[in-house]
Amino acid sequence: MKAPVRVAVTGAAGQIGYALLFRIASGEMLGKDQPVILQLLELSNEKAQAALKGVMMELEDCAFPLLAGMVGTDDAEVAFKDIDVALLVGARPRGPGMERKDLLLENAKIFTAQGAALNKVAKRDVKVLVVGNPANTNAYIAMKSAPDLNPKNFTAMLRLDHNRALSQLALKLGKPVGGIEKLVVWGNHSPTMYPDYRFATSDGASIGDAINDQEWNASTFIPTVGKRGAAIIEARGLSSAASAANAAIDHVRDWVLGSNGKWVTMGVPSDGSYGISEGVIFGFPVTTENGQYSLVKDLPIDDFSQKYIDKTLAELEEERSGVSHLLG
C-alpha cells in the first residue's frame, strides 16, 4: 500500500466541503490505490466546529478503505502540518451591501494568514488550489504570503468555468462532452473570464468551423458561461457547491496524475506569456505531467480575443492593486 497523502481542506464543513470530502476519501481525486489523511480546518466558533465534527462522523461511517486518518481543527498550522495538497475552499462570502473591495480586504486577511501557515508547516512541494472567491486574487495573496514556497505551487480554480464551457459547447453541437478537446478559458474566475473555443475540436473536427457563428459566441456562449454561477443561485437558492467540488477534484487529479496530453485550464502565476503581467494568477491553457503543469504557448490571439483578455486582466490588476498595501 502507498504511504498516505495528507490533504488539507479549509471551510471543510461548508457546502463545497461537504460535496468534496467524500469523493476525496473514496479515491476519486488522487487515485483508487492512494490512501489519504484529511486535515480539516473550520472557523473557531462553536457552530462551525460542531458541524465539522458531524461531517467527520459521517466520513467515519462511510468506512472508506482509503481514509487513513482525519484531523479536525480551527488552527491553520495544525491543518497544514506536513500536507501534500491544500484545497483552500473557505472564504468570506459577499454580504448584503458589501462592496467588492471590502470583500477583497476581508479575504486578504484570511489568505495572508493561511499563506503564512503554509509557508511555515506545509511540505515544500505542497500543491495549493484556491477555490474560495475571489479565487485568483486569494491565490495571489496566499502565494505572496509564502515566500519560501515556489510560486508555481499556488493555483486558482478556473476548472468550473472550463467545465461549464465544455457542456455549453456539447449542447450546441449535440455531441458528447467527452469528445471535446483544446478548449481554453482565459483570465479571472469572474464574469469577465473568456471561454475561447477557437482551437477546440470535437472528435478531432474544428468546433469553430462547426458552429461558425460569432454572434452566438459573443451574445450567448460567453455570457452564459460567465453568468452561470448567478443563474444557479437564482434557480436553486444556493450557490453551485457540487459542481465546484467536482471541478476542484478534476483540477487536482489532473495536476497530480497528469492530463494525458489534454489541455486543461488552471489559474497559475503568469510567466509573462500572452502579455499577461508576470506573477498575476491568470487562467491559462496548460498540460500536466508528473505533478507539474506547462503552459500551452504561442497560440495566436485575434483582436476579438485580445479585447476580452485585456478586460479580464484589467480586473485582476485592479484587484491586485487593491490588496498590494497588505503584502509588503
Swiss-Prot record:
Residues that hold substrate according to the record: 94, 100, 133, 164
InterPro entries noted in UniProt: L-lactate/malate_DH (IPR001557), Lactate/malate_DH_C (IPR022383), Lactate/malate_DH_N (IPR001236), Lactate_DH/Glyco_Ohase_4_C (IPR015955), Malate_DH_type2 (IPR010945), NAD(P)-bd_dom_sf (IPR036291)
Active-site residues from the entry: 189 (proton acceptor)
Pfam families in the record: Ldh_1_C, Ldh_1_N
Alphabetic keyword roster: NAD, Oxidoreductase, Tricarboxylic acid cycle
One GO term of the biological process aspect: tricarboxylic acid cycle
Top EC class of this enzyme: oxidoreductase
CDD domains named in the record: MDH_chloroplast-like
Residue sites binding NAD(+) per the record: 11-17, 107, 114, 131-133
EC number: 1.1.1.37
A molecular function GO annotation: L-malate dehydrogenase (NAD+) activity
SUPFAM superfamilies given in the database record: LDH C-terminal domain-like, NAD(P)-binding Rossmann-fold domains
Reactions it catalyzes: (S)-malate + NAD(+) = oxaloacetate + NADH + H(+)
UniProt similarity note: Belongs to the LDH/MDH superfamily. MDH type 2 family.
Role summary: Catalyzes the reversible oxidation of malate to oxaloacetate.
Stored NCBIfam families: MalateDH-SF1, PRK05442.1
Name used for this protein in its record: Malate dehydrogenase
Gene designation per UniProt: mdh
